[in-house]
Amino acid sequence: VIAGRIANRLNLGGTNCTVDAACASSLSAMKMAISDLLEYRADMMIAGGVDADNSPMMYMCFSKTPAFTSGENPRPFDQDSGGVMIGEGLGMVVLKRLEDAQRDGDRVYALIKGIGASSDGKFKSIYAPRSSGQAKALKRAYEDANVEPLSIGLLEAHGTGTDAGDLAEFEGLKEIFNSDKAKNSDYPNYQHIALGSIKSQIGH
């Protein structure tokens, strides 16, 4: 009842629910919130993610997982990367339609032009990422935003820092940015798109 408790305390009358999609939970929650806004089922939505491993047993279980780094500095997409680092915390955003935010005099920090999601389906295991699924989510996001992928100059990645995760994500990026269309592109950023992962520095 966590989401319901927040709605109760803040006197919010829209949809409230908890979304569990592992590493994609906050993005999935945002996608649901955006849908409610665009379809005028709500005028404001609060969405985000939280991770709090409040049990010693959780830390013990995670410590046995080979995907987790033994060091302090995760290095996604680096040959010296040792794996993923877990972090605890909470991040939330308040979402409104742009015209409503401007009308209300709100401070607008960012504009979401589009969003995309996908699932890997049946693959090697439920924990193994699939590059085609990554590419599908990217493609849907760019199409939803009506943005040409090659026009961007910075890409924020998931960046787990694991061999399997980084490889699948990078292969998905190559599928989008290294197509025949990309090779014939006139966009100035085609040869240089910065790749970062703030999430890996905070913790997954």
PLM ranges: what are they?
Residues V1-H204:
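Condensing-enzyme catalytic core of the thiolase-fold
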